[in-house]
């Protein structure tokens, strides 16, 4: 193991929960919900949701960016922070737990960085909370200025400028403003800020091998906070040159990302990405202020320098510039007890953790207990065979998926899919009602939702829920191949609807859509169902391989240059094709030996 991959940790799977426990020991004004490991929520110790008389400000996202977001929980800033696994969006249940814990009659505002997984998970949680009677608004922050105006649905990434939006919203809420006004101030603040980052090294996730993608003497402009590739790799330059370039990109009139012109008042935030010494950050600040004043004709009213939104151990920095007026300055100057704004840690220490709140009584459902049948029907045996083969194939493919994803994403596709597959294999032994295909599909979705973070987890949960609903429409006791095709069609439609992708976007749908087309064609032609599934599996594999030639239109791959995309297929599509093909082959073999 090389030096850069050394970590002061125990189990890589426990880093987020152990970080939260350490944070709470430092600051008596914070608590966490007693729901580890699925629920990882840090909240203000002085807030009780049902009695809280101000708008709650809630944010969060994947961990690995500390002190963001939990370090900015405190009076005058965030009311709660929802922590996902490292670089993975928090799950919907965790977000809902946070909403229920701190939201009173005034409602809550969710401030979400613009990443697909965060948008989907926070969006679904918001809709569920609304159905339970909570008032919820959501503001999405996309302050990235490094890349050209993006194509597709992904949009600009949320970066360190999000913290300035947190502060504005937190101060507005502390004044007692209603939810609509707080949301309006946050939205306006998000439109006033632009950010660009520069990395001298890529980050190393706990338990992962250090990437050598960024070599000696090189820097990467616009590298993402999850390690995804940026706008360009260049030779390392003196800091004066680098800062000048970054500010020109943020303030570029060609992209017009921020409404800042000569004579504007601005706020400057210099943010370390995790491994940059404070000395270097202060050097950057010392260059940036006169550059803004003399070269761009701006009045710099406030400067904040430190490591606020990091990327684990990445060496580098980001600069955020926000257009300011007196109203924004008043919000930024308002008092806060958020420990990493920073503020002191005075006050009595309450209990470190409190129970996870239950849903309101009117929405509590008495769910039936599901279990594995003592005796499997012929249909149950076939379903078990297909599930076991599909999940085992995903387990075996973990390293390949991670290798591909290291080039076009954040390198965790295989690990994420692996967690879901292992959970499916374990839960099937105890809980899956295999004689009931619809309920089994629903339970697969529950297994995935419990352990899989990020966009893959929520999309596969949506996939299973839609397939389950379609299968439940069937009144017959036996599910036929036509029923499975209809369920696959409904699942694909749901993923496309909520995820925003379709054929040609370089996603898992580029494997599943061809599979569905081939399956329906062969079944309509009267083919044997097992043979039809084999042919459709071949179509899935061909579709997945074809993603090498596609320009990404969804997810983090949107930000990756075309020459890198062309070197590997989409990991999500390859995973989908692999489990589909494994299931089809296993069912075919089962029929042949019957």
Swiss-Prot record:
Keywords, comma-separated and alphabetical: ATP-binding, Kinase, Nucleotide-binding, Transferase
Binding site for substrate: 62-65, 113, 118
Domain DhaL span(s) in chain numbering: 381-585
Residue span of region Disordered: 339-358
GO molecular function: ATP binding; glycerone kinase activity
SS bond partners: none
Any single Pfam family the record assigns to this protein: Dak2
InterPro entries, per the entry: DhaK_ATP, DhaK_dom, DhaL_dom, DhaL_dom_sf, Dihydroxyacetone_Kinase
GO biological process: glycerol catabolic process
Family, per entry: Belongs to the dihydroxyacetone kinase (DAK) family.
Alphabetical list of PANTHER family matching this protein: TRIOKINASE/FMN CYCLASE (PTHR28629), TRIOKINASE_FMN CYCLASE (PTHR28629:SF4)
Name under which the protein is recorded: Putative 3,4-dihydroxy-2-butanone kinase
Source species of the chain: Solanum lycopersicum (Tomato)
Gene that this polypeptide is encoded by: DHBK
